Amino acid sequence: MIVDLEASSAEDAVALKEKITDKLHNFIVAENYEAIFSISIGVIDAATFCEGTEECRKKFEFALKQAKSMGKNGFYVFDQDDYEVFLQKGRIVAALRNAVVNHYDGFEVYYQPIVDCQTEQIIGAEALMRFSMITEEGREFVSPMEFIPLLEETGLIIPAGRYILNEAAAMCCEMQKYIPDFRMNVNVSYVQILQGNVERDILDAIQKYALKPECLCVEMTESGFMDMTPSFCKFRKSLEKNGISFVIDDFGTGYSNLHCIRDMNPSYVKMDRDFTAKAMNSDRDYELYKNIIPMVHSINVRICAEGIEEKEWLLKMKEMKVDYLQGYYFGRPCGKKQFLQQYASGINVK
């Protein structure tokens, strides 16, 4: 329902909402109905934000949608900045859909080296999804923080994830010409597990490129499987059965704990980059970081420290006997061609 109200402020709209609520309540009581209801209200100053009926309708629908997203009896006053964010999300989703149906044009895989902490030699890489969309100014890179949640919301992460997985497997095969035991880490989303058949996708990629199963490592953040235990356990058992490595990403954030490591039995855990940075700049965090390492090692799980940016940090990680390292000190994520040029030799990365 749309109400055209002459009002001097949003408070007038709130007052109207209360009147409507009271009227409905009194009617229900008087007629002896049994009903539970709530009223969500979106408010827009049409004189300020609308130039025509169609624009007003679209912006009002947005305001009402925002109000409903706040829960029962939600109330939202139109904000132009929020609306611009909403429109940008719509543009990104449209671009993602278009890319998927056009042979993944706009998607690209970047690779960041993972090195052995003691020898400083490259032993693998993490495959990272990147996306750019066409705008009036040309190609515009979209932050993974923006487009990956949208891929998950729309289900497009299933075909896009399959594409990235195959590209990463092909790159692993290429790198093994130079580094025989090279391993590739690929991120998997909870949506791929719940709605797709990612186990089959992984096995198909391994078979297609004749990879040893242990050379393909599946990464997931703990938040990705906290709320889907049955589905995740089935997925985890499938990985174990087929000899595919499993890695817990971003350890040290959110719900991450040692019980998780014990129950999930990963090949190794990746210490979150922010956790690493704090440990390098705070004695208290350093002691915590240092004491976690032997506990994790005691249950036969290795550790990769993310976010290594300085030589001093590298030396501290050596002292703490961390197994693997990843970070800008060894190399920023880059495309396939650049990665091959820089790291195919297999020598020390620095």
Identify the function of each model-found stretch.
Residues 35-40, 107, 125, 182-184, ...:
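PAS and PAS-like sensory/regulatory domains
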Residues 88-150, 187, 248, 305, ...:
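Active-site core of bacterial EAL-family cyclic-dinucleotide phosphodiesterase domains
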Residues 47, 62-108, 118, 150-157, ...:
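C-di-GMP signaling machinery
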Residues 1-90:
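Cyclic-dinucleotide signaling modules
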Residues 21, 25, 172-176, 206-207, ...:
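Surface-exposed amphipathic alpha-helices with a cationic face
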